[in-house]
C-alpha cells in the first residue's frame, strides 16, 4: 500500500513539474483556497487561534489572514518538490543580514539557528551559504515518501536530516565537532519549557536554547516571508545574547521565553505568513471538548 501511495505521489509530482513555475504557484493558491474551504478542522483551528492572538481584529480581517496563511503553506509545500532549482535562481531569494550567519560561523563553535513555521519555511536555510546544515524532522509514515523527501532536502540545502525520536539529542550533540549550522524549528508546541505565547500559557521546544547554552554556540533567529511574486525574503537577526546564570534550568526557561517573545513580534508583523492551522495552544481540542453549545454555534458556519 505504501509503495502504491508513493507511485501516485511521484506521478502527481511528475505532472506538476511539467508546468511552468508560475502556474505551479497558481495551482498552490488554488489548493490553498480549496483546503481552507474543505478541511473544516484546520480552518476552525486557524480562525480560533487568530481570534485568540488578535482579539482587536474583525472577523473579516481574521478570515483574510487565515486564507492567506493556507495559500502560503500549500505553496511552500509544493515548492519543496523543486527546491533545488528554486533556490538556485538568484532572483527568487533576498537575504537580509546574511553576514550575521558568517560572523557567527567564524567563531568556530558551530551555529544554532532557530527557525519558524512561516513563509517558505525551509527556504530560510539558503542563508547558510555553502555551510553544511543539520536539522530534525519527523519521520513520515510512508518510508518511500520519507526517503524521497529526505533526498530532496539534502540536494537543495546541503542538509543532513536527523529523525526525531528519543535519541535525537544525543545524535545532535555527537555532531557538534563537525561545526555545522543547526537549524531547528522552535515555534510549535513540543516538550520543553512552559511559556506565555500570545497571552496564553503553552509549551515550547527548548532543544535549540539548551544546546546553545550548554555548548556556547552563537544563537540567531532565521525566518522568511513568501512574497506575492513568489520570491522570498530571508531575515537573519543579530546574534541573540542568551542570559546566563548559575542555574541552567532557569536559564533555559528564561531564554526560551525570550525567544518566544521575539518570534511573537515577528508573527505580529507578518501574521499571514505563519502556520495558524496547527493546534499550537490546544485551542481546537478545547473547543471540541469544553465550549458550551451556544459558543459552538458561533463558529459552526466558519
Regions found by a protein language model. Name each.
Residues 1-115, 146-148:
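Membrane-anchoring hydrophobic helices of lipid-metabolizing enzymes
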Residues 7, 42, 93, 164, ...:
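Soluble or luminal CAZymes and related metallo-dependent hydrolases
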Residues 11, 46, 148-149, 157, ...:
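Hydrophobic alpha-helical segments typical of transmembrane helices
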Residues 64-67, 106, 130, 134, ...:
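Non-catalytic C-terminal accessory region of glycerolipid acyltransferases
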Residues 87-93, 112, 138, 158-163, ...:
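Short, flexible loop segments at the rims of nucleotide/cofactor-binding pockets, characterized by
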Residues 95, 161, 219-221:
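Conserved beta-strand scaffold positions in the cores of enzyme catalytic domains, especially
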Residues 107-166, 190-193:
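Catalytic core of membrane glycerolipid acyltransferases/transacylases, capturing the structured
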Amino acid at each position: 500500500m505504501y509503495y502504491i501511495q508513493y507511485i501516485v505521489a511521484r506521478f502527481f509530482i511528475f505532472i506538476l513539474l511539467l508546468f511552468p513555475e508560475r502556474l505551479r504557484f497558481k495551482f498552490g493558491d488554488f489548493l490553498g483556497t480549496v483546503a481552507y474551504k474543505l478541511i473544516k478542522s484546520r480552518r476552525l483551528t486557524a480562525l480560533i487561534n487568530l481570534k485568540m492572538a488578535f482579539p482587536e481584529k474583525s472577523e473579516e480581517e481574521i478570515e483574510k489572514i487565515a486564507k492567506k496563511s493556507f495559500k502560503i503553506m500549500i505553496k511552500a509545500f509544493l515548492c519543496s518538490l523543486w527546491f533545488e532549482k528554486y533556490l538556485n535562481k538568484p532572483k527568487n531569494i533576498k537575504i537580509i543580514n546574511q553576514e550575521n550567519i558568517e560572523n557567527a560561523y567564524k567563531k568556530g563553535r558551530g551555529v544554532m539557528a532557530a527557525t519558524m513555521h512561516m513563509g517558505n519555511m525551509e527556504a530560510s536555510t539558503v542563508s547558510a551559504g555553502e555551510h553544511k546544515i543539520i536539522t530534525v524532522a519527523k519521520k513520515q509514515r510512508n518510508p518511500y515518501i520519507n526517503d524521497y523527501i529526505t533526498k530532496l532536502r539534502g540536494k537543495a540545502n546541503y542538509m543532513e536530516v536527523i529523525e526525531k525520536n528519543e535519541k535525537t539529542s544525543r545524535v545532535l550533540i555527537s555532531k557538534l565537532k563537525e561545526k555545522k549550522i543547526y537549524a531547528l524549528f522552535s515555534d510549535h508546541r513540543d516538550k520543553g519549557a512552559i511559556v506565555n505565547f500570545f497571552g496564553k500559557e503553552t509549551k515550547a521546544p527548548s532543544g535549540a536554547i539548551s544546546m546553545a547554552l550548554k555548548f556556547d554556540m552563537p544563537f540567531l533567529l532565521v525566518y522568511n516571508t513568501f512574497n506575492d511574486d513568489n520570491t522570498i525574503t530571508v531575515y537573519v537577526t543579530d546574534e541573540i545574547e542568551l542570559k546566563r546564570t548559575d542555574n541552567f534550568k532557569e536559564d533555559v526557561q528564561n531564554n526560551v521565553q525570550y525567544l518566544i517573545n521575539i518570534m511573537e513580534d515577528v508573527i505580529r508583523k507578518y501574521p499571514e505568513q505563519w502556520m495558524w492551522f496547527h493546534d499550537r495552544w490546544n485551542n481546537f481540542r478545547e473547543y471540541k471538548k469544553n465550549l458550551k453549545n451556544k459558543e459552538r454555534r458561533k463558529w459552526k458556519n466558519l
